[in-house]
UniProtKB/Swiss-Prot annotation:
It holds the Pfam family Glycos_trans_3N. The gene is trpD. It catalyses: N-(5-phospho-beta-D-ribosyl)anthranilate + diphosphate = 5-phospho-alpha-D-ribose 1-diphosphate + anthranilate. The lineage of its organism: Bacteria, Pseudomonadati, Pseudomonadota, Alphaproteobacteria, Hyphomicrobiales. This is Anthranilate phosphoribosyltransferase. The keyword Zinc does not apply. Pathway: Amino-acid biosynthesis; L-tryptophan biosynthesis; L-tryptophan from chorismate: step 2/5. Homodimer. GO terms for biological process: L-tryptophan biosynthetic process.
Amino acid sequence: MNEFKPLLGKVATGASLTRDEAAYVFDKMMSGEATPSQMGALLMGLRVRGETVEEIAGAVSVMRSKMLSVEAPSEAVDVVGTGGDASGSYNISTCASFIVAGAGVPVAKHGNRALSSKSGAADVLAALGVRIDLDPAGISRCIAEAGIGFMFAPSHHPAMKHVGPTRVEMGTRTIFNLLGPLSNPAGVTRQMVGVFAKSWIVPLAEVLRTLGSQKAFVVHGSDGLDEITISGGTDIAVLDEGRIHTFTIMPEDVGLKRHPAEDLKGGDAVHNAKALRTVLDGAEGAYRDVSLFNAAAALVVAGRAKDLKEGVEMARVSLDTGSARARLEHLVAVSEKLAPEAAQ
C-alpha cells in the first residue's frame, strides 16, 4: 500500500494515472487494502477531473480478474446500461434481452438490483419468477437450455464488498458505475452498453476496444436515457473490428413511431414485470417499440442483422411468433429447476 499515497497525490494534482497505475490502486481497493478515506478521496478525485480511458481500462482489468466467471457461447451478447440516468424508465434492456434470445442469439445478461430507479434488472426478473441466485454452472445451463441467463452482479464480483460502503457513503456517481457494464462475467465480446451521458459514448467504446471487444454499440438517448430512445434521437458509438465511428438515429429511420419520454416511465418491480409480460404477449405501444429498437441494436452487434432496420424486423418476428415470450417461460422453468434448494 506504500504506492497508494503517491498515486493519490498524483490524482490530487489533476494528473492522470497510467493503465498500470490505475490497476494498482483498484487492486488495493478491491483487495481491502485501502482505507475508506483513501478510496473516497481517489474516487472523488477521478470523478471531479474526469476518468480517462486508460484509468477505466486498468480498473476494469482488475475487476474482471477478480470476478466469478460463467461459461457462455462465444457469440453471446449482453444488453446493459450504466444506470444513473434518473429516468425511472421501464426495464427496457431486460425486455430487449428476451427478444434477442427469441431471435436465436444467446444472451448473457449482467445486472443488479435498482440503484437509482425503482426496478433494476434483478428486481424485475425476480418478480417475473426467474431465480437470480444460481451458481455459475446453473447460469451456463440457463444460457444453453433457455437461450438466456442472468448473472447477478454482487454474486460475481465479491471483491466489490470492499468498496460498497464507501460508495454508499459518497452517494454520488463514481467510476464504478462505468465498470459494472464493462465487466460481464461471461466475458462477452459483443455488447450494447447504454450510458448516462453523451460524453461517455466514445470513451467507453475506446475502453471496450482496448479490452478486446469485437463489436459494440455504446448509446445515449437525447432524453437522457441510457438506452436507445424513441422520444427523439439516440447518439451511438459503434466499435467494429477495432474501428470506432458515431452516428445519430431516430425512431422514424427504422420504421418506428415516436413516443413521448413520459410513456417510457416505469414503476416498481411488480409494475414493470407486468408491463414486460404485456410486451411479450404482443401489446402495442411505447414499451414495445423501445424494446424492439434496443433489441435491434443487439441483433446488429451479434452479427445477425445487417442494420438497425433489419434488426427491428427480426425483433418483431421474435415477439409476434411468441418466441421471446417462450424464452422467458423457459428461463423461469430452468432457473427454478436449478435453484439451490432444488438441488438438495
